[in-house]
C-alpha cells in the first residue's frame, strides 16, 4: 500500500497515466493524491475528470482555483474561454454528473496517521490545523449547497487581503477561498498579495512566499501543495513539498512516493501552445 502524490494535472491525461504506470499504481491497494487543478489548459480535461471519478476511495484530491472556475462556468456564472480547452468537457453527456461529483470534493486533505496535509495553494500562515479544517469546511458547505451559483459568482475577488476570525459573510468565504486555492505571496503582517506569480528572486523585498513566514500549523505535519508552477518544486523548507512543475506549460508532471520520499517525473508530451 503506497501513497502517491501528484501536482496539478491540468488536463494532461496521457502524462498522468504514464506517470502512474512508472510506479505500477494499483487502485485496489494504493492511494492517489492530487493537488487540484485537474482540468484546463491541457488537451484532455474530460478524460482526467472521468478517470479521477472512477478511482473512488483510491483518490484523495483537493479543489484548485481552475476547478472552481469550471464549476462557475457550468453554473452559468462565467464564460468559457476556448483557450482553456474545456469546450468538449462542457458538452459531454455526463458533464452534470461530473460537476456534481466535483463539487463534493474537499479543499483540504489531512491524514493524521501520515502527518500529511494537502491543499491546492498552501496553508495560510496564521491558521493552525483546526482553523484550516474549519475554514475549508465552510467553503465545502457552500459548494454543496443550493446557493452554489451565488457563492461562485462572489468568490473570485482579490479582497479581503487580511485575515481575522471575525470576518463574516462573503468577505470571510472570499478570503478562505483565496488562501486555499490562489495564495502565493504574503506581506510580513500576513496579508495576501494576489498579483505576483513569479519566483521569489523576482519580487519586491516586502513580499514573502507563504511558506517562509512563521506558521501556526503544528510542526509535525508536512504540507503538500500545487498551484505555483514557477517554483518548479524548489525553494521550500523541509517538510513542505511543492508539486506543480508545469506540465501544461511544456515542462513535466511530478509524482512523490510518500513512503519513500522519492520523486518520479514525466516530461510533457506537448507544450501548452501546441494543445
Swiss-Prot record:
Top-level EC class: hydrolase
InterPro entries the UniProt entry points to: ApaH, Calcineurin-like_PHP_ApaH, Metallo-depent_PP-like
Catalysed reactions, semicolon-separated: P(1),P(4)-bis(5'-adenosyl) tetraphosphate + H2O = 2 ADP + 2 H(+)
Pfam families: Metallophos (PF00149)
SUPFAM superfamilies xref list: Metallo-dependent phosphatases
Keywords: Hydrolase
Protein family according to the UniProt entry: Belongs to the Ap4A hydrolase family.
Protein name per Swiss-Prot or TrEMBL: Bis(5'-nucleosyl)-tetraphosphatase, symmetrical
Lineage, uppermost ranks: Bacteria, Pseudomonadati, Pseudomonadota, Gammaproteobacteria, Enterobacterales
Gene: apaH
Amino acid at each position: 500500500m503506497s501513497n502517491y502524490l501528484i501536482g496539478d494535472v491540468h488536463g494532461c491525461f496521457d502524462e498522468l497515466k504514464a506517470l502512474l504506470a512508472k510506479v505500477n499504481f494499483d487502485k485496489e491497494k494504493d492511494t492517489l493524491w492530487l493537488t487540484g487543478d485537474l482540468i484546463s489548459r491541457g488537451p484532455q480535461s474530460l478524460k482526467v475528470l472521468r478517470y479521477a471519478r472512477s478511482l473512488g476511495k483510491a483518490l484523495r484530491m483537493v479543489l484548485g482555483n481552475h476547478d472552481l472556475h469550471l464549476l462557475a462556468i457550468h453554473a452559468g456564472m462565467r464564460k468559457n474561454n476556448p483557450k482553456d480547452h474545456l469546450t468538449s468537457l462542457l458538452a459531454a453527456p455526463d458533464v452534470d454528473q461530473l460537476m456534481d461529483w466535483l463539487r463534493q470534493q474537499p479543499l483540504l486533505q489531512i491524514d493524521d496517521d501520515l502527518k500529511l496535509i494537502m491543499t491546492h495553494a498552501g496553508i495560510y500562515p496564521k491558521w493552525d490545523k483546526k482553523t484550516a479544517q474549519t475554514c475549508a469546511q465552510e467553503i465545502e458547505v457552500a459548494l454543496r449547497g443550493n446557493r452554489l451559483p451565488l457563492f461562485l459568482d462572489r468568490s473570485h475577488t482579490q479582497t479581503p487581503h487580511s485575515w481575522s476570525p471575525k470576518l463574516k459573510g462573503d468577505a470571510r468565504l472570499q478570503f478562505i477561498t483565496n488562501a486555499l486555492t490562489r495564495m502565493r505571496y504574503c506581506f510580513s503582517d500576513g496579508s495576501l498579495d494576489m498579483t505576483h506569480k513569479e519566483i521569489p528572486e523576482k519580487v519586491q523585498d516586502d513580499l514573502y512566499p507563504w511558506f517562509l513566514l512563521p506558521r501556526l500549523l503544528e510542526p509535525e505535519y508536512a504540507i503538500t501543495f500545487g498551484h505555483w508552477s514557477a517554483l518548479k518544486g524548489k525553494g521550500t523548507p523541509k517538510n513542505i513539498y511543492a508539486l506543480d512543475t508545469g506540465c501544461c506549460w511544456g515542462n513535466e508532471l511530478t509524482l512523490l512516493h510518500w513512503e519513500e520520499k522519492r520523486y518520479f517525473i514525466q516530461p510533457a508530451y506537448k507544450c501548452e501552445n501546441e494543445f
